[in-house]
Amino acid sequence: MSKAPLAVALQYEKGTVPVPRVVAKGRGDTGEAILRLAREHGVPIEENAALAEALAQVELGEDIPEALYRAVAEVLIFILRASGKLK
């Protein structure tokens, strides 16, 4: 596995986007740029190398596969709780 930063951005909007979808992904300089933009815009970042590698296999604009629903749901719940949007 490469040491270059890997970043995968997901879009999910309850009621609008029913399944999280991959909207950006990249390794190295591109991964760093995705992370920088996320930080600049206050987008939560979760570090999970195994999940990022699995999500990186999904084509841009595609919904995540059902096999990753649980792992992604756990990340979304963590983010919502951390932001105070879920108690």
Give the role of each language-model region.
Residues 1-87:
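Divalent-cation
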